[in-house]
């Protein structure tokens, strides 16, 4: 069975698909599970990540819905056509992204917009696409199309089975720009629920805290964007933050064609949204975060998925 047929079949068999989401009113989950399904239900009493790599903590993305983040950034190996999540939240591939190609047997984690591997009608839709022409990434050749309706399979998480992420298509998705903006700006106490950090003295990025956050004992956290060193965690301290529900977006840099830059200096994460000929994204660097950024779609940015 081809990936395209499998994705279409999964979209039609709604009753048989697992759906897990955070329920905002009581912070529990609604779960529909087919018989003999091994994917765990959400347990709000437990934090960290479950067996398919979904955070047990919940994050509001509008006034009524919450989501659960994946355990790490999305990664891809072209030689085996395999998708996975980074083993650690602070992990990124770095300069090896310059080796991007259809035959590359290493891993990449910087992708052009909409490059799930589904033939969306764009000239560049494969994960290894490295064209530097922004219009090559327009879904069906139209700059206005995004990951909705008949084009939902352009979303990396919807179209692909992710090993150690449930290993089945249709379980994950990319946040919209509006959802990212809600996380950073519109949640209750939003300004206190994120901050820059350095992990193990070398990994720079932004920490996002869940709605119901309780700081672990003997650990300090300062919200805001006053430099990478505003929060410094050892690996042991970060493990405790992670177990309490914290999410970390590493400053993984960017790629243009085969040129990689700004590793550990900037983080740029695609959303599913468009703005005219641009793709919307969140961007951050030392002392600044912009959840309303836009950029040409040919650039390779990070992808962080949430459970559908």
Language model regions located:
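C-terminal, surface-exposed recognition/capping segments
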Residues: 32, 39-41, 54, 74-78, ...
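A short glycine-rich, aromatic-capped structural motif
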Residues: 54-148, 173-174, 178-184
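Basic side chains
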Residues: 3-4, 24, 71, 304, ...
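Sec-dependent bacterial lipoprotein signal peptides
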Residues: 1-20
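Bacterial Sec-dependent N-terminal signal peptides
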Residues: 16-58, 305
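Intrinsically disordered, low-complexity segments enriched in small/polar residues
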Residues: 9, 14, 46, 51, ...
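Intrinsically disordered, low-complexity coil segments
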Residues: 63, 166-167
């Amino acid at each position: 069975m081809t990936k395209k047929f499998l994705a279409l079949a999964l979209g039609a068999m709604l009753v048989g698909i697992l759906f897990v989401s955070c329920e905002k009113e009581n912070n529990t989950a609604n779960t529909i599970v087919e018989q003999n399904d091994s994917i765990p239900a959400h347990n709000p009493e437990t934090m960290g990540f479950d067996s398919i790599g979904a955070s047990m903590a919940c994050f509001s993305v509008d006034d009524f819905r919450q989501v659960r983040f994946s355990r790490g950034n999305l990664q891809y190996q072209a030689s085996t056509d395999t998708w996975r999540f980074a083993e650690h939240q602070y992990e990124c591939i770095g300069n090896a992204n310059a080796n991007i190609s259809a035959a590359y047997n290493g891993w990449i984690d910087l992708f052009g917009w909409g490059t799930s591997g589904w033939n969306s009608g764009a000239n560049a839709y494969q994960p290894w696409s490295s064209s530097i022409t922004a219009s090559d990434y327009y879904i069906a050749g139209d700059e206005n199309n995004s990951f909705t309706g008949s084009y939902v399979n352009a979303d990396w998480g919807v179209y692909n089975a992710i090993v150690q992420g449930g290993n089945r298509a249709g379980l994950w998705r990319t946040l919209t720009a509006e959802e990212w903006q809600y996380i950073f700006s519109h949640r209750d106490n939003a300004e206190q629920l994120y901050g820059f950090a350095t992990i193990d003295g070398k990994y720079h990025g932004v920490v996002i805290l869940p709605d119901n956050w309780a700081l672990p004992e003997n650990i300090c956290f300062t919200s805001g964007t006053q430099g990478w060193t505003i929060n410094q965690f050892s690996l042991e301290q970060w493990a405790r933050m992670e177990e309490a529900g914290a999410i970390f977006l590493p400053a993984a840099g960017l790629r243009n064609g085969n040129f990689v830059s700004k590793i550990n200096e900037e983080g740029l994460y695609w959303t599913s949204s468009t703005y005219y000929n641009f793709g919307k994204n969140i961007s951050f660097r030392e002392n600044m975060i912009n959840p309303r950024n836009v950029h040409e779609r040919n650039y390779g940015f990070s992808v962080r998925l949430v459970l559908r």
